[in-house]
Swiss-Prot record:
Catalytic activity, as annotated: heme b + 2 H(+) = protoporphyrin IX + Fe(2+)
The protein, known as: Ferrochelatase
Single GO biological process annotation from the record: heme biosynthetic process
A molecular-function term among this protein's GO annotations: ferrochelatase activity
Species of the source: Vibrio parahaemolyticus serotype O3:K6 (strain RIMD 2210633)
HAMAP family in the cross-refs: Ferrochelatase
Chief location category: cytoplasm
The keyword Repeat is assigned to this record: no
Cited Pfam families: Ferrochelatase
InterPro entries referenced in this protein's UniProt entry, alphabetically: Ferrochelatase (IPR001015), Ferrochelatase_AS (IPR019772), Ferrochelatase_C (IPR033644), Ferrochelatase_N (IPR033659)
Length: 320
């Protein structure tokens, strides 16, 4: 049944393996780590390392990590992404489809699903609040590739970022206040963002400035002083220097500054996933507690919270 409304939304996130198995993880990581936006090493140097060392060794290990956070309905990121798309479609009364930069459903399949519903103009909403070439620009690259496979290219608009949007900041602040009401307030609120190599920022990627702005605005919304809130970067790999301070190193040392009860959130992640549920709520909790911490509280991502959906709807309306 074709829609009378010729506009639709493509909700985009990074993606996830189809299942928590070594072969599925290997397929996903191969696609992800082949992207020059993610790893910009010369291909003749990088590909032998990727296929000869990283994928054979990392895939089984990462599969076990995925298995530890896998939900009955599937991967956490996919479960929450589907819920977001369903709620946003109901909120806007227009077609909304998912498209992942890597894995399934692909960006191409997302466009095809919208076109099949009669959509002629697509609003693309990458769920990356803070812009980075490694994420947002990779979506743009993927769209270009997808259009090559479509018989007719739809008109489209692209929401680049929303790191300082008032509704995004308030949704974050509300989630913190709500968590504090239920669990109590810690000594310090740490905002952990996915890291990128420092070299990328040195070459002009504006990601760290966006992360800093989000943290500052969130602190203002919560009425926190600079010694009550801070930020760090997680998920680094390889030997190259990444953006600092590092989340794990911060958690190792912050107890010596009198912080025994910490609250940690991940504002750059729109949905809970391996990096939030296993790396932060699992691994990094252990680091903090072993360093002398007494209480570690992970504040979940916005996921399919109503205020998060309201914000998405407002972003889409700005393009209608």
């Amino acid at each position: 049944m074709q829609t009378k409304n010729k506009q639709g939304v493509l909700l985009v996130n990074l993606g996830t393996p189809d299942e928590p198995t070594a072969p599925a993880v290997k397929r996903f990581l191969s696609q992800f780590l082949h992207d020059h936006r993610v790893v910009d090493m010369t291909r003749w140097l990088w590909c032998p390392i990727l296929h000869g060392v990283i994928l054979p060794i990392r895939s089984p290990k990462v599969a076990k990590l995925y298995e530890s956070v896998w939900m009955e309905e599937g991967s956490p990121l996919m479960v929450y992404s589907k819920r977001q798309a369903k709620k946003l479609a109901q909120h806007l009364d227009m077609p909304v489809e998912l498209g992942m930069t890597y894995g399934n459903p692909s960006l191409q399949s997302g466009f095809e699903a919208l076109i099949a519903q009669g959509v002629e103009e697509v609003i693309v909403l990458p769920l990356y609040p803070q812009y980075s070439g490694t994420t947002t620009a990779a979506v743009s690259d993927g769209i270009t590739k997808a259009f090559k496979q479509l018989p007719v290219m739809p008109a489209f608009s692209f929401i680049r970022d929303y790191h300082d949007h008032p509704m995004y900041i308030e949704a974050l602040a509300h989630s913190v206040r709500q968590y504090w009401e239920e669990h109590g307030k810690g000594d310090y609120l740490l905002c952990s963002y996915h890291g990128i190599p420092k070299r990328y920022a040195d070459n002009g990627d504006i990601y760290p400035q966006h992360c800093e702005a989000t943290t500052r605005l969130l602190g203002e919304a919560l009425g926190l002083s600079s010694d009550q809130i801070g930020m760090a970067y997680q998920s680094r790999f390889g030997r190259e220097e990444w953006l600092q301070p590092y989340t794990d190193k911060t958690l190792e040392t912050i107890t010596s500054k009198g912080v025994k009860k910490i609250d940690i959130m991940t504002p750059a992640f729109s949905s809970d996933c391996l990096e939030t549920l296993e790396e932060i709520a699992g691994e990094n909790k252990e680091i903090f507690m072993e360093a002398g911490g007494e209480q570690f509280h992970y504040i979940p991502c916005l996921n399919d919270d109503d205020m998060h959906i309201d914000m998405m709807a407002e972003l889409v309306r700005s393009k209608l």
